[in-house]
Curated annotation (Swiss-Prot):
Descriptive protein name: Proline--tRNA ligase
Record's GO cellular component terms: aminoacyl-tRNA synthetase multienzyme complex; cytoplasm
PROSITE patterns in the record: AA_TRNA_LIGASE_II
Originating species: Frankia alni (strain DSM 45986 / CECT 9034 / ACN14a)
Enzyme Commission number: 6.1.1.15
Cellular location(s): Cytoplasm
Assembly and binders: Homodimer.
Amino acid sequence: MAVLTSRATDFPRWYQDVLAKAELADNGPVRGTMVIRPYGYAIWERMQADVDARIKAAGAVNAYFPLFIPESYLRREAEHVEGFSPELAVVTIGGGKELEEPVVVRPTSETIIGEYLAKWTQSYRDLPLLLNQWANVVRWELRPRLFLRSSEFLWQEGHTAHVDEAEAAAYARRIALEVYRDFLTDVLAIPVFIGTKTRKERFAGATNTMTCEGMMGDGKALQMATSHELGQNFARAFDIDFLGADGAKHLAWTTSWGSSTRMVGGLIMAHGDDNGLRIPPRLAPTQVVVLPVRDDETVVAKAREIAAALTDAGLRVQVDARSGLSFGRRVTDAEIKGIPVRVEVGPRDLAAGNVTLVRRDTSVKAAVPLAEAAARVPALLDEVQAGLHAEALALRESRTADVTTVADAAAAAQTGFARIPWRLVGEEGEARLAEDALTVRCLQTPDGEIPPAGGDPDDLICLIARSY
């Protein structure tokens, strides 16, 4: 009997199987909540560490703001509260008494951080103010799916204030490119389309939203990260102003941007196969698993010796010598968990002076001299990283069609992405597509870049797809 449902047979069921068998997550007791198991959290910690370093390289610093937000804060920005109202969790009783003012459980923090940006911004010398926080947020989800849509999830959200529109726009763009696109491409090995959201799809209260859209294994789109230009909407609502170099008062220009545990779901669906996860080596909590073929003292000792050499080479290594589990069961476990390379150590191999290296992405095996194993594995990991990206890119290219009518776009988007000039779609065509559960994922320049500010929308290409 197969361990996992085949992706071709039932992709959603396969996804649930991977979550369970790879021990990534489980459903919480309240509908829409999620328990992230240790292995799933280890993957998230690796994501956090890399993204956090990129955010800090872009000049932002970490802070933390309250989970509870006065309801009146959200009402200050009308478009923002309207966009989030259906998803809000509101607390009306505290300490057994009805609260004087209801408080909202944080759905995002533009409002409460805006309150403090106003407090901390007095002069142009205080700007730019670049903040990030790692937190949980709550958005009541009617159709939950672990990692993809949950009522509570983990994320980072950045919030910045700037002296002028150009500086704010440039920073939001920098985050979209240097933090999100580069991380998704270089670490998660997921090639993403990057562009701007349409008026209908942009973040509530934003003047512009940039998005990274990945194609999953079933051809659907997943929004992986977003970066928003907020104009002066929140600055006006929260009085974020400053004394300029000219001696006059000016409103600040603000941005916000975020990525979440949804990226874990994207990792599963972009790279997973019928044997389970396939984790890119740059991300993998364990890059190499060393498997003794037999529960033999000499073989296990040699396996630990090999693991020590690989650890000394700077790799993240695990020895799986669990007694009571067959070699085949341990191989299956390593495959389901997506460990990029396994080193199989058996008595026959050792007698010949070899070990066997196995790539998780291709299942290709190679016998290598024992003395060369520690030197060979790092290069093999690089090959796995490149191979996963190449495979994901090939899938995206094979399932992305250039079309010239809305009808053809709708047909192509049943199994992948459709690219079509925006002037042939427009807001009227976008509304028609929504009737078939299709959305415009983003607008791009013809060469696939983020559209320039003030450009003619008729010159842009839009990407249409089904989405998660």
